[in-house]
Amino acid sequence: ADSIAQYYHVEGDCAQRLEAALLRTLRHNAGNGHTCLPRTQLLETASNFIHQPPEKLAAALDECIRTEELRVKLFDGTPYIYLPDLLEAEEDIAARLAMLTKRGKNTAHGLDKNIQILELTQGFAYAPLQKEAIRKAMTENCLVLTGGPGTGKTTTVNAILQLLEDQAERVALCAPTGRAAKRLSELTGRKASTIHRLLEVDYTGGVVSFIHNDKNLLKCDVVILDEMSMVDVKLFQALIAALRYSCRIIMVGDADQLPSVGPGNILGEIIR
């Protein structure tokens, strides 16, 4: 960075160069899966990158915040710096999830009896935690089903699917990758797709967007999203924005499994 600046006769403490270093640091950070950085850490990292004192970068950062090129949010008194689109995505997700959880619960008449019938049909009894998850999936608008390998997530999902289908609910099964979607389809015996295929990617105008969005909602009653740990903040924002007001979402995953490639640890943050 220094040699390029010298070649083009750019002063080391030029305002544009300082601001570019801050943006580069946050974008690099996003590429490593993080949506923000504490202010102090951002200044130190950018300082090491362009060999300028943190004090000069602090002035550039304040200007970026003033012009809203960057955004700041306090957590426990510590200022965290965001790229605007990532903060907007986080806040949008939080607002939509809050709206889902505050919505009235769904009625499920004869649920315990239907679970018993399912157990007789399957030839085995569900564990108490599995039954609790099944009940919540049938009554709650937003549910996280989590656990490590071998904890019965697939068995629980299949029970939920059977009960939803018995009620003629329209269910969309999806996962963040093609491999995960194929595995979900094999384990459930039902069609599953990637989130991108479910939302239908639109390349019109050279900008990647989705045909299904907050103005063209998905026509389903329940979305079951597998491998939630791999879903980044922007993709989850796109999915949850495309849900109808009455649509429910069931998120399945293991927070200790593969993280998302893009920024954001959605599953881990929801669990916490």
Task: State each model region's role.
Residues 1-272:
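Conserved ATP-binding/catalytic motifs of P-loop helicase motor domains
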